[in-house]
Amino acid sequence: MSNELKKTPLYQTFVDSGAKIVEFGGWAMPVQFSSIKEEHNAVRTEMGLFDVSHMGEIIIKGSDASNLVQYLLSNDTDNVTTHKAQYTALCNEQGGIIDDLITYKLEENVYLLVVNAGNTEKDFEWMYEKAKAFDAEVINVSTEYGQLAIQGPKARDLVQQYVNIDVSEMKPFEFEQNVEFFGKNVILSQSGYTGEDGFEIYCNADDAPYLWDEILKNDVTPCGLGARDTLRLEAGLPLHGQDLSETITPYEAGIAFAAKPLIEADFIGKSVLKDQKENGSKRRTVGLEMIDKGIPRTGYEVYDLDGNQIGEITSGTQSPLTGKSIGLALINRDAFEMGKEVVVQVRKRQVKAKIVKKNQISK
């Protein structure tokens, strides 16, 4: 493994445990501990533990911080409170998604933005440049934080045993600061990237190995990036760099709920997003399920039954839950019809698929 790759505080723990390490977004990360299927199914039926310390953390603070945060982000940041986080997008002037992220308000005019690992430097530079017009400071604090995710139907009961607050009623994106977890001070967020109940835990970077070891003493399955990807795909959750990019808008990506272009406040990309909200976007993201044998992979072309290309695959895998090959595709809006049969070009073969819901695990 190259010494140039960044490493989380848990890297040595993973090497010692025999986890398979791969490069991801410039980081040396575990792709699996046992098998992807085993880890995936543990999260769907019981619970799994992920190291997500590679994610970036950026602080925005100052007397004008709230105005800067709203100017940068596509959602209505007035709805962000010291107990309620928000999923949102960092957009360019064309409405394209520079990154998708979560915003936490730590106190008045102090915000924590959690961004994708491979985009941290790019995001920071973009925010730093835009902040020059505001009385606000942008600080990259990524090295100070560790982040763990406990996910699965049994996650809440486990977390409750070791925290000093009641988590039984915590709803998605609610969070609490200064929570004691295995004796360490953490931010506890009811969030995740699997489609299951669970929590993301922000801790001091130095505390991450201790917390990892303590959690694993409770019959929790350690999980790698492989299961994280299959889990998020079953749930229809997008990945930046594949399903989201600087040339794809929130309306095209299926995350319109993260864009609020009708609010009074201005933000970058607002005019384009307002037009797409009022008039529709030319493309949309759909779920696909393969009818014939073959796994849809990123970049594979999608055609209608008349042979016209209507889009391409952005993500795909074989679902460990159902055994079916599934994917997400960005297609022309006028080609969309739920249940419609399409053709995916899998190498030299044309393979039939059908349009389905993106979230394939929703009850």
UniProtKB/Swiss-Prot annotation:
Gene Ontology biological-process annotations: glycine decarboxylation via glycine cleavage system
Keywords linked to the UniProt accession: Aminotransferase, Transferase
A Pfam short name: GCV_T
Transferase in keyword set: yes
Gene3D superfamilies found in the cross-reference section: Aminomethyltransferase beta-barrel domains, Aminomethyltransferase fragment, Probable tRNA modification gtpase trme, domain 1
A GO-annotated cellular component: glycine cleavage complex
E.C. number: 2.1.2.10
GO function term, MF aspect, one: transaminase activity
Paired cysteines (S-S): none
Catalytically driven reaction(s): N(6)-[(R)-S(8)-aminomethyldihydrolipoyl]-L-lysyl-[protein] + (6S)-5,6,7,8-tetrahydrofolate = N(6)-[(R)-dihydrolipoyl]-L-lysyl-[protein] + (6R)-5,10-methylene-5,6,7,8-tetrahydrofolate + NH4(+)
Alphabetized InterPro entries for the sequence: GCS_T, GCS_T_bac, GCST_C, GCV_T_N, GcvT/YgfZ/DmdA, GcvT/YgfZ_C, TrmE/GcvT_dom1
SUPFAM superfamilies, sorted: Aminomethyltransferase beta-barrel domain, Folate-binding domain
Family: Belongs to the GcvT family.
Annotated HAMAP family: GcvT (MF_00259)
Function: The glycine cleavage system catalyzes the degradation of glycine.
UniProt subunit comment: The glycine cleavage system is composed of four proteins: P, T, L and H.
Protein name stated in the entry: Aminomethyltransferase
Organism, scientific name: Staphylococcus saprophyticus subsp. saprophyticus (strain ATCC 15305 / DSM 20229 / NCIMB 8711 / NCTC 7292 / S-41)
The organism's taxonomic lineage, starting at the top: Bacteria, Bacillati, Bacillota, Bacilli, Bacillales
Name of the coding gene: gcvT
